[in-house]
Amino acid sequence: MGHIHNMKITLVNPPYPPSVHSHPPFIPLGLAYLGAVAEKAGHYVTIVDCQAEKLTYHAFRQRISQIQSDIIGVTATTLLYKSAMQLINTAKEIHPNAVTMLGGSHGTFWDENALNEYPSLDIVVRREGETTFIELLDKLQTENSFDNVLGITFRNKEGKISRNPDRPFIEDLDVLPFPAHHLLPLDSLKRMGKVLFPLVTSRGCVYWCDFCSTVRMFGRGYRMRSPKNVVDEMELIHNKYGVNQVTFYDDAFTVNRERVVKICEELHQRKLDLMWDCGTRVDMVDRELLKTMRDAGCIAVWLGVESGSETILGAMNKRIKLDQTRLAYKTAHEVGLMTIANVVLGFPGETEQTARKTINFVKELNPDDVGFYVATPYPGTPMYEQVIKNGWLRVTDFNKYDTANPTFETPSLSIEKLAEIRYKAYQEFYLRPGYVLKMMRRGGTYGVSAVKTSAAYALRAMHIKLS
């Protein structure tokens, strides 16, 4: 290839598998970061977001054949893995000389398997991708070998699979350019009429819950962007795209209390009137902090409940107590913030009794909304190892790993029972008369969506009774 200074790069967000209840599209932040670093290095970047643009495999084939590409990189979670690989097969067929790459959480822990399963795949970029990606682009231009590129697993000249050591994490996240939103199909990313812009202000997590693959992807060290850098990005997207609401995608936004306070102060100083929400742990909020957040535009907090059973919380390695959860919800409500509960059902050790405790506990907390997720064994997590070791896995098709459908069963809980429990959990939560009234009074995006959901469950309940 010799010295080409500008490589043509196509980055792809794969479509959901056909069987999956498709979510409203989210901005693919990982690709937007890769696009930004590649553009900064002088390359041409195109992002194809199959979810936002509702592209089928056939439509993708047409699209990719119109884009000159030296490099085709596809991102994938476990749920999107097969879909991603189908796109890589297609891309390789149309551009046989292009280098194909897989990135994201699934490839990170399934790297050698992916290269073995799909000859059309050339390189897996593991863990954090920005530095690795730029280094690969440099190597491709100078025709050097990839032997010294940290953080990749690849097919070498002899066709053998080589796994290079991990790349150390990026310590100073402020060096990263802001995500390249201009490369995204923003018009197709609207939800209820507006684009919800996500920001990630930290990477890594000090806690290591057994069901979580994110921490294993981004490490134990909690790395933070500076308050100024965070608010610079908020101001930029506000000015450039007229955005008035953002959402923080950090695993736990309030790990460092002082930084959150500084972000809030910075927002006040710049008179940035933005609404925002964030997710965090129940043991990392207090009244003062929540008030400070509220006064700086925070409208909602996602607080990880996970379970209403101390036994299961212990098994998850979650390290919280139910009283901490109670206090966090009570305080958030008193301060006037909306709350959304994240709950995991069916973690190994779950029984009908512990699941019942959890459902009752969630009703007691009375959050404004809830997500009941089925414990799903993602490769790379201790939970996955445990499920495999005990021979509990029943579903090996990754297209079914959507956190709505159970994939394994334990002696204490069958797949059928777990599916039924999850449905009941939602039904009981949304059909409480007090809940519907509260949401009707609230109005706004959250209120309307909650009332619609309740109505859907009511209709299904009636239908079941009638049929």
Give short role names for the model-derived ranges.
Residues 2-6, 11, 44, 61, ...:
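Radical SAM enzyme core and accessory elements
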Residues 111-117, 289, 349-363:
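Catalytic cores of alpha/beta
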Residues 18-20, 111, 157, 207, ...:
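Flexible glycine/acidic-rich beta-alpha junction loops that bind and position SAM and/or redox cofactors
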Residues 7-10, 15-18, 146-149, 155-201:
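N-terminal [4Fe-4S]-dependent radical SAM core
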